[in-house]
Amino acid sequence: MNKVLCFLCHKKTKPLSMMVDFFSKNRSNKIIIHVDSKSDINEFSCFSAYSNVILLSERHNVLWGGMGMVSATISLLKEALNHKFDYLFLLSGDDLVCVDERYLDDFLNNINLFNLIHYQDERNGYVNPDNRVKYRYPSFFFKKESNRLDYLRRLFFKLFKFSRINKEYHNFISSGHRFYKGSQWFGLNHKTVSDIILFLNENSWYLDLYRDSLIPDEVFFHTLIKYIGINDLYSDKTKVSDALRYTDWITGPDYPRSLDYDDVDKIKKSGCLFARKFKHDTSVHLFDELRKSV
C-alpha cells in the first residue's frame, strides 16, 4: 500500500526522527514534513538524506489557536497529491505508531480505506463549534500562555463580542448548514484528500469563513467533509477515538500528558494505530515495545 505520512512540527524530536526512519524504509511510503516558519529549517536538514522524505518549501507561521495550522495542513495535502498514494495520515512531531506496518496496511484494507477522523460525541466532552467561528477573534487570543493584560482583553472581548460578529458565519448557518468539531489528527483516503483540495481550489469563500476564527483546525476539515458529502467514515464506539489515536487528556499534569513506559500496555490494548504525545527524548526501546503484538 502506498501511504503518505504528513507531519506538522516546530522542532526536531526523537519521536519524529524514529518515525521518519521507520516509515522511510518502505519505499512505497512518502513522508512530507511542514516545519513552522519560526523554526530553523537547518535543524531538519538530516532528513534530506532520505529519498522519500520531503521538507515543504512553503512554510506557515503556526500560532496556537490560529489559522496557520489549517494553512499548513492544506499545504501538506496539496503536496501529497503530487505523489501516488492510497492513504494519508496527518501526524505531529510527537506521535508514534503503535502497530507494525503490516498490521497497519491490513487494517486499512479491512476497513476498505474508510476515513479515520473523529467527530466529538459521548466519548469526550462537548464543545460548541459555532463559538469558534461566530466571531472574528483579535490576535491576543492566539497565545498558548497568556499574561494578565491578555486576560483583561479577553474579558473586554466577551462583553463586546457582538461588535466582532463574523458575517460569513451567519451566511453559512442561514443556508441550512452547521459546523462540526473533532480531533485535528486524521487519516484520509486519496479520494477524500483530492475532493477536499478540489473544493478549496474552487471555493475561496470557505477559507474566508474561518478568517480570525479560534482553534479552527478542530472544525475546518470536519465541517468541510460533511459539507461536501463524504460519508465513508470509520466508526467504532468501543474505541477511544474514531481516528484511532491514543491521547491522555485526563491524568495530567500536562494536557495532553506526555506518555512513557507506564502507558505502553494501555496504548496497545486500546486498538489505536498512533499515540501522542511522547517526550522529545523517548527511547528506541519504548518505540519497539509499542509495536509488539498484545
Predicted regions located by residue number:
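ER/Golgi luminal nucleotide-sugar-dependent glycosyltransferases, focusing on the catalytic module
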Residues: 1-294
